[in-house]
């Protein structure tokens, strides 16, 4: 598995969330789980699974009669990649400009500010 996590659409995130919760799963198990939350047709969910397999975000176990699907990346790896993409697109790739905007616009309590200071103080300098 390479370090570069492929981009995942919002709909594909829903499929991934099901697989991160419990894997491996058959296509029918993924469909059943998603139909409890989303108003999607089984064909739509199968298409999303196929896309995730093509992107190499989801693997397929073909050792059995039933194919089972499993994530090739952890939820944390995908969240980190998504956050970096967001930072590049919206904030020119710098964490500082995003943090400044959030800090200036948020109502922070003294406790919030102390916690942020503590996190920054514990962070090793580069």
Give the predicted meaning of each segment.
Residues 80-124:
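Amphipathic alpha-helical dimerization/coiled-coil segments
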Residues 56:
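Glycine-centered, phosphate/nucleic-acid-interacting loop/turn motifs that mediate DNA/RNA or nucleotide
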Residues 19-24, 36-37:
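Short helix-capping/hinge SLiMs at alpha-helix to coil transitions
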Residues 25-33:
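Short acidic, hydrophobic short linear motifs in intrinsically disordered regions
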Residues 32-40:
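Short helix-coil junctions and helix-kink-helix linkers
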């Amino acid at each position: 598995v390479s370090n570069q996590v492929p981009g995942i659409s919002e709909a594909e995130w829903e499929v991934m969330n099901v697989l991160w919760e419990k894997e491996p799963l058959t296509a029918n198990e993924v469909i059943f789980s998603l139909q409890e939350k989303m108003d999607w047709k089984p064909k739509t969910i199968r298409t999303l699974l196929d896309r995730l397999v093509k992107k190499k975000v989801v693997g397929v176990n073909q050792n059995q009669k039933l194919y089972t699907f499993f994530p090739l990346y952890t939820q944390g790896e995908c969240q980190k990649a998504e956050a970096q993409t967001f930072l590049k697109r919206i904030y020119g790739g710098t964490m500082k400009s995003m943090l400044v905007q959030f800090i200036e616009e948020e109502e922070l309590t003294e406790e919030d500010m102390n916690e942020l200071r503590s996190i920054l103080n514990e962070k090793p300098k580069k």
